[in-house]
Amino acid sequence: MTQAERVLGDIATRLLVENDRVKIWEMDLAPGEDSDVHEHTMDYILVVIEGDRIAGVPEPDSKGLYNEYIEADVQPGQYFYIEKGGIETARNIGKRRYREIAIELKD
């Protein structure tokens, strides 16, 4: 499949809230489960709710900070500010369910 033929999904499992300032999403992945391939078109804040280990699998044309495969131990309460540009799949490589809240910042 070429990049032009690629179908991108939502950045997380479920959209919780949207207004003129933010979009708030929930990501929920069982152990071994992958998210859809998705593109981050806005800067966002990621807050870990549950889980122990996650991987980010970038697409070849991913931009931004996370443009290489990454694995990370995570803990509930951790948060990260991430700039837009990433095109990736999230993969739960842990032993526990992984849940996060992603807050996309509109300008």
Where are these regions (language model features)?
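Histidine-centered active-site/metal-ligand motif
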Residues: 38-40, 88
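Short beta-strand segments in beta-sandwich/barrel cores
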Residues: 34-36, 52-57, 79
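Glycine- and acidic-residue-biased ligand/ion/polar-headgroup-sensing regions
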Residues: 41-63
